[in-house]
Design a protein with these regions (language model features):
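Active-site helix of classical SDR
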Residues: 11, 36, 44
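Residue(s) in the substrate-gating loop at a strand-loop-helix junction
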Residues: 20
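Hydrophobic alpha-helix immediately C-terminal to the catalytic Tyr-X-X-X-Lys motif of short-chain
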Residues: 39, 43-47, 51, 61, ...
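Active-site loop immediately N-terminal to the catalytic Tyr-X3-Lys motif
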Residues: 25-31, 53, 91, 109
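Active-site loop-to-helix junction immediately N-terminal to the catalytic Tyr of the SDR YXXXK motif
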Residues: 26-34, 46, 70-71
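Short, flexible catalytic-loop segment of classical short-chain dehydrogenase/reductase
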Residues: 41, 62-73
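Alpha-helical segment proximal to the catalytic Tyr-Lys
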Residues: 4, 49-53, 112
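C-terminal substrate-recognition "lid" of short-chain dehydrogenase/reductases
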Residues: 57, 92-121, 126
Length: 128
């Protein structure tokens, strides 16, 4: 509905999808999750091509494990937490505040030439 209204009213702007680092890599026992995130990456790229001529940019923010109520049950498992942090070259889990900069950037005119892109906020996980 938002896109329809933007197109109907000739409103230019920025759509920011949220994916995951797992939309760029695979992982054991995460087939469904990774597949859904790969789908968001493809959706973002397709919409960027489709909506770009109308001045609508579409990008994705792809975080690593962020400490939230959703990830809390996984991170209570000390072995899982240790293994996860071991995959992140910066050596720490993400915090919600780590995502603020990328979202503000993508929503602003500072990213006016970006569309169909992903910003990985993963502490280096996907650099491996």
């Amino acid at each position: 509905n938002v896109v329809k209204k933007m197109l109907h009213n000739n409103i230019k702007g920025s759509i920011i999808n949220v994916s995951s680092q797992m939309g760029h890599v695979g992982g054991p026992n995460r087939t469904t999750y990774c597949s859904s995130k790969f789908a968001i990456e493809g959706f973002t790229k397709s919409l960027a091509i489709e909506l770009g001529p109308n001045g609508i940019r579409v990008n994705t923010v792809c975080p690593t494990f962020i400490q939230t109520p959703m990830t809390e049950p996984f991170l209570k498992d000390e072995e899982f937490k240790k293994t996860t942090i071991g995959m992140i070259p910066l050596g720490r889990l993400g915090e919600v505040k780590d995502l603020m900069g990328p979202f503000v950037f993508l929503a602003s005119e500072a990213s006016s030439l970006m569309t169909g892109s992903s910003i990985l906020v993963d502490g280096g996980w996907t650099a491996r």
